[in-house]
Amino acid sequence: MAVPKAKTSKWRRNQRRAQNFFNKFRRSLPSLSVCSNCGERIIPHRVCPYCGHYKGKEVIETE
C-alpha cells in the first residue's frame, strides 16, 4: 500500500481543499450563449425562453 513520505502541512492540505470549494461555484453557474434570433443571453442547447426559437426555428409560440 502507498504510504506518504512526509507529513502534509496544513497549508498544502488547505490549498487542496480550497479547489473543491471553488469548483462547487463554478459548476453551479451555467455558461451562457446568445440567442441567434433575439440576442438574449440563454443557456446553450435549450429553447430560448424569450422568443421560443431553437437553432433558427420557432419551437414554441410566445407572446
Curated annotation (Swiss-Prot):
Protein name: Large ribosomal subunit protein bL32
Gene3D superfamilies recorded: Single helix bin (1.20.5.640)
InterPro entries: Ribosomal_bL32, Ribosomal_bL32_bact, Ribosomal_zn-bd
Species this chain originates from: Aquifex aeolicus (strain VF5)
PANTHER family: 50S RIBOSOMAL PROTEIN L32, LARGE RIBOSOMAL SUBUNIT PROTEIN BL32
Family of this protein: Belongs to the bacterial ribosomal protein bL32 family.
Pfam families named among the record's database cross-references: Ribosomal_L32p (PF01783)
Keyword terms: Ribonucleoprotein, Ribosomal protein
GO-annotated cellular components: large ribosomal subunit
NCBIfam families recorded: rpmF_bact
GO MF annotations in UniProt: structural constituent of ribosome
GO biological process: translation
